[in-house]
From Swiss-Prot:
Protein name in the entry: Bacitracin transport ATP-binding protein BcrA
Binding site for ATP: 40-47
Role according to the record: Essential for high-level bacitracin resistance. Part of the ABC transporter complex BcrAB. Probably responsible for energy coupling to the transport system.
Matches recorded under SUPFAM superfamilies: P-loop containing nucleoside triphosphate hydrolases
Coiled-coil annotated residue ranges, if any: none
Residues that span the membrane, as ranges: none
Source organism per UniProt: Enterococcus faecalis (Streptococcus faecalis)
Length: 308
């Protein structure tokens, strides 16, 4: 049996500000060479957890291991392997994108002469490198942040909301770039987001945070196996439809929201249920076969409401 190698591990990682616990005993496991998506509403504790991994905030309790080593040991060696964006990247507004990266490269050290140019090309800013940062769009600023994080070719990327502010084309490009970086270069990527559809498309593993707790950690392939198929009816009266399912077919595996009833029980055909609804005077305006996605799963896990 192969032992999984983790690039990031936390054990009972906790952060308190006064009497408020913002991260509560989380145990994260980020496999080497994989993309780990950390999901959660704003205020769930995602950014604070990432800050503790980078020593931008210090744990109240618990430990962090990077590359199998306690991050308090050999700190400079460990962090030379890490690139990161936490919250909004900071740059000099009166300097060009290229000049900003040159300064950061000198401060960081270990960046090859071609590293800055290559990073700008990878994120699609090579033609804009002489433009002053204050003239960059929000999406361009976000790309420059990613360029700063990758210019020293790190083994681990920690990215807090990296697609924030990007248009659909930019999101697609960054998604493709991160996937390529992971699958071709073996870079481990730890990414936070509240955009469920984007995480679902690129992540190998997801963790879900809610009110400071890590409530789930699961391989995306396993999650897809769990997602259940269902038939959805839009009807004139959902409560009557529910009573029909219970009395006529003894069904209990369904949900009702207003005039939409979602049936997970396939003991009866869709045609039979449709006829029974019609016989009881219900108007059916839509029938659709589908299966639950990551958003459905997330909503059930944290009690509905989605991510805001």
């Amino acid at each position: 049996m192969m032992i999984m190698e983790y690039v990031i591990e936390t054990e009972n990682l906790t952060k308190q500000y006064g009497e408020t616990t913002v991260v509560n005993k989380i145990n994260l496991h980020v496999p080497k060479g994989k993309i780990y998506g950390l999901l959660g509403r704003n205020g769930a504790g995602k950014t604070t957890a990432m800050k503790m991994m980078l020593q931008l905030a210090f744990p109240t309790d618990g430990t962090v291991r990077l590359f199998g080593t306690n991050y308090k040991e050999n700190i400079h060696t460990l962090y030379s392997k890490v690139g990161s964006i936490i919250e909004t990247p900071g740059f000099y507004s009166n300097l060009t994108g290229y000049e900003n990266l040159q300064i950061l490269a000198k401060l960081r050290g270990g960046v090859s002469k071609s590293g800055v140019e290559k990073a700008l090309e990878v994120v699609g800013l090579h033609k804009e490198k002489r433009k002053v940062f204050s003239d960059y769009s929000l999406g361009m600023k976000q790309r420059l942040g990613i360029a700063a994080a990758i210019m020293h070719e790190p083994e681990l990327l920690i990215l807090d909301e990296p697609i924030n502010g990007l248009d659909p084309i930019g999101i697609s490009e960054i998604r493709s770039f991160l996937s390529k970086l992971s699958h071709e270069n073996g870079t481990t990527i730890f990414i936070s987001s509240h955009v469920l559809s984007e995480i679902e498309q690129i992540a190998d593993v997801i963790g879900v945070m809610h009110e400071g707790h890590l409530v789930e950690e699961v391989n995306i392939s396993e999650l897809h196996k769990r997602n259940r198929k269902y038939t959805e009816f839009d009807v004139s009266d959902g409560k009557i439809a529910a009573k029909i399912l219970e009395s006529s077919y003894h069904m209990t595996d369904f949900t009702v929201q207003d005039g939409t009833i979602r049936i997970y029980d396939f003991s009866q055909s869709v045609g039979e249920i449709n006829r029974e609804f019609a016989r009881n005077g219900l108007l059916i305006t839509r029938i659709n076969d589908s299966e639950e996605n990551l958003e459905d799963y997330f909503s059930k896990l944290i009690g509905g409401g989605g991510i805001a």
